[in-house]
């Protein structure tokens, strides 16, 4: 039977395997797509290793919390299709629960943690690779262990998650702050957390942008102008300096009014820092058929 491009594409969509793997399986199965798919499932363990070098930039965040302890884990997949699969969602939630229960503080510890069924997270991940047909990776985890209030929030699409450590105040305020961080994504907590080299660089930029007339002003006046601009920039990049999304005053004012203090926060964004590969499936099929 002729192995057509459409047949290869259909098998790829069913299995998530590479074009060349699909073409080879179809050739060995004499064009029987069901037999080819079954053969590829049987060789799933080998495929799991091959998938490890494929870019996994999609995925979801898993959240688990128990009192003053909470954990966020990032589990990556190759496509949004798999990220929205119920089996993948269940796996992510199970990973988060295992991470919390085990007291894991890094990814390697998460991988070694035991799930409710007795398997390690790593063993379950390898099975998920076979079942879902994509490179699945446990990429990052963050946790908070506090005597204060935890604001835990994961956006409905599972792509952005936040843990806020609030000393004082209440859980409602802590969650509101977590939602704020998820929405505006401030790089820093307070002005004191902003790196000095960032501030100096911004001063240089603001000075360079000034007109010659302004630069000619007395040094004390010039310093006040630049300081005002820098204060605005620092406010924009800090949680405390931003206007609270659920109010009309700054976060600092809201927190202080509650007699509280934000000890810190953790923000995860799925796929952040990963270079995504834009695939041309038509070209990939054509290339596979030429071999």
Curated annotation (Swiss-Prot):
Highest taxon above the source species: Bacteria
UniProt subcellular location: Cytoplasm
InterPro entries registered for this protein in UniProt: EF-Ts_dimer_sf, Transl_elong_EFTs/EF1B, Transl_elong_EFTs/EF1B_dimer, Transl_elong_Ts_CS, UBA-like_sf
Pfam family, one: EF_TS
A GO term for molecular function: translation elongation factor activity
GO cellular component, one term: cytoplasm
Record-linked PROSITE patterns: EF_TS_1 (PS01126), EF_TS_2 (PS01127)
Alphabetic keyword roster: Cytoplasm, Elongation factor, Protein biosynthesis
Region (Involved in Mg(2+) ion dislocation from EF-Tu): 79-82
PANTHER family: ELONGATION FACTOR TS, ELONGATION FACTOR TS, MITOCHONDRIAL
Family assignment from sequence similarity: Belongs to the EF-Ts family.
NCBIfam families: tsf (TIGR00116)
HAMAP family for this protein: EF_Ts (MF_00050)
Function: Associates with the EF-Tu.GDP complex and induces the exchange of GDP to GTP. It remains bound to the aminoacyl-tRNA.EF-Tu.GTP complex up to the GTP hydrolysis stage on the ribosome.
Protein's name according to its UniProt entry: Elongation factor Ts
Source organism of the structure: Stenotrophomonas maltophilia (strain K279a)
Taxonomic lineage of the native organism: Bacteria, Pseudomonadati, Pseudomonadota, Gammaproteobacteria, Lysobacterales
